[in-house]
Amino acid sequence: MYVSSILKSEEIASFIANMNKDATHHVGYCGDQKEELLHTILHDFSDIGWEKSFVVTYENNKIIGVLGFDVDEVKKCAEIWGPFIKAENWEEVALYMWKELIEKVPFHIEEFYGFYHVENDNCARLMKNLHAKEQGRHSILILNNIVEQRIICNVGEALPQVFEQFIAVHNHVFPNTYYEGNEIIERLSDTNKLFVSMKNEKLEGYVYVEINPEFQEANIEFIATAENSRRKGVGERLLQAAIQYIFSFQGMREIEI
C-alpha cells in the first residue's frame, strides 16, 4: 500500500463516481457522474488547488482509496470527500490517508465537515474515532419535471436593496453553515439566483438556487422564512418559485433539495 505523489484527476473522478453510486460508500458533497466530478475537481474544488487537496492510495498498482478536502482557506475549514475505499482493511487505509492528507495541506484546518449516507457505516465510525460531533441528519428529496408555470404572488428575484435584510435572516437561521449571507450574494450569477418574498418592504423569506446547465444539475441550497412569517404559506410559494425557475432550463429533468 502506498500513496502516489502523481495524481491523475480523471482517475480520481472515475473512482469516486463508481464508489458514490453505492449507499454504503456515499458522500453527500459529491455526485456520481464522472464528467461532472472531473469538472468540479478541476474548476471548483478547494482554495489550495486540487493537487494539494487529494491523496490516492494504491495496492498492486490499482487504486484502493481516495480522500479529498474541499478547503476554504479563509475559514480554515474543509468538507471531506471520502474516504472512498475498496479494501478489506478499510479503517487502516482510511487513517493512513487521513494522516497523509493532513500533512499535505499547507496550514492547520480548524474544522472539518462530513456529510454521509445513513448506510455509510465505515465513514460514520471513522468520524466517531476522530471525535467528530454529529450536527444533524438531513433528507435529500428529488423532484421530477411535472411543474406547470404560473405567477407566484409576492415572490421575485432579490434586488440589492434587500440584501442587508437577507443577510441578517440567513445568518440568524443558519449560523454555522457552508455559505454565509454575504458569500451567497457574491455567488449570484446568470444561473445562481436568490428569490425573496416581500411584504410591506419587509423580507418574509428567501430561497437560494444554484444551477449548472452544462450538467443539467440544480440544487436548492437554502430556503428559510423570517420568524414572524412562518405558517403562512411563504415557504411553499418560495419553493414553487425555485422549482419553476429550475425547470425553465432546457433539459433539466430533476432537482435535489
What are these regions (language model features)?
Residues 1-39, 138, 148-177:
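Short amphipathic alpha-helix that is part of the acyltransferase structural core
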Residues 31, 36-96, 207-226:
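Conserved donor-binding loop and adjoining core beta-sheet/short helix segment
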Residues 37, 151-218:
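Flexible, substrate/cofactor-facing loop regions flanked by secondary structure
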Residues 90-103, 225, 231-244:
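Conserved acetyl-CoA-binding loop-helix of GNAT-fold acetyltransferases
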Residues 105-117, 246-257:
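Conserved GNAT acetyl-CoA-binding A-motif
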Residues 118-136, 236:
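Conserved active-site alpha-helix within GNAT-family acetyltransferase domains
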Residues 133-145:
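Conserved catalytic-core motifs of GNAT/GCN5-like acyltransferases
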